[in-house]
């Protein structure tokens, strides 16, 4: 009796869902790119953002932003506070200032 293929054998490869990220400081765009996930330090706690996240706006405190990009391990930057807006797989971080954190 023939055996039907499992769904994993017939399914097309799943496209990885990414978010578009823009980190903006007073002097202009600090970084822009795509990420698997973004973690920001909101005043009410750490906020993790993935694709298909509900729209949200939050105030950020000074701390580290973690960017998990498709082609590298997690990158971190330090911000001095600001705001984050998430809408339709787009993440905009408006920061007072930003600097890259060196890998240890």
Residues of each region from the PLM?
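N-terminal export/targeting signal detector
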Residues: 1-20, 29
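Compact, glycine-rich, soluble single-domain proteins
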Residues: 20-104
């Amino acid at each position: 009796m023939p055996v039907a293929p499992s769904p994993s054998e017939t399914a097309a490869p799943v496209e990885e869902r990414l978010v578009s990220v823009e980190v903006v400081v007073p002097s202009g765009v600090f970084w822009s790119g795509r990420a698997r996930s973004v973690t920001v330090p909101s005043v009410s706690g750490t906020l993790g953002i993935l694709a298909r996240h509900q729209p949200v706006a939050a105030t950020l405190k000074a701390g580290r932003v973690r960017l998990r990009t498709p082609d590298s391990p997690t990158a971190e930057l330090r911000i001095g506070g600001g705001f984050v807006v998430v809408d339709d797989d787009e993440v905009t971080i408006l920061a007072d200032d930003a600097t890259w954190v060196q890998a240890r």
